[in-house]
Each structure stands twice: as C-alpha cells, then as structure tokens.
Amino acid sequence: MSNDTKIDFKKMDGLTPGIVQDAQTGEVLMLGFLNPESFAKTIESGFVTFWSRTRQKLWMKGETSGNRLRIVSVSTDCDQDTLLFRVFVEGDGLVCHEGTVSCFTRPLTLDASASAREATRG
C-alpha cells in the first residue's frame, strides 16, 4: 500500500471493515473492524489488530491463543473504505473463537437467503 493512500474511516463512525484472507489458500478467514489507532498498530506491528466494538479497546487477533495474523500484504478497495489483509496464521491456524480455521462456517441455503431478502424488503 502506498504511503499516500488514505483510508476512509468516516463512513462507519470511525471504523472500516478488515477482511482477513489466508495468503496461501485464498480462504476468507474472518471480518473485523479497525479504527485509525488499530490500523496504525497493525502497520507498525505487522500483525492484524482490530478495534473491539464490544469491549471498546484494541484487540490483536490471536494475542491470547497464539493464532496471530501475520500480514503478508494489505490492500484497500476502490473506495478506500475496506481493507483486505492477506495473512499467515501463526499457531495452530484456528482463527475463529469457536475453534475453526474460518469464522465463515455456517452455510445458508438458497431458500433461507431468499427469505432473508424478503425480510429486508418488508
């Protein structure tokens, strides 16, 4: 990421989504949120650090479990309001707090997706 890239933290009340992807497999592992402070800490440390919306504090993913997310590369989307971190997962590779590699483990059926679309229209 070039030094002149400015991340847009204004659209979501000071936060921007951070998508985490395994650099080797391409699998999407998780989504978290960053504020300017957590983004600066991420770039400085080389490990993904989020802003915990629940605890209202910085949260280096894997700091306790040992499954830290070491950054291989970082990029932004065309609007500069979403970040993509390609990472190497340290430790046993289980990123999700439920003990799975990815947080995205609950498939939706097409019928459920259609029902969800209908619910949002009403």
What is each PLM-predicted segment?
Residues 2-15, 21-29, 34-122:
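C-terminal binding/interaction regions
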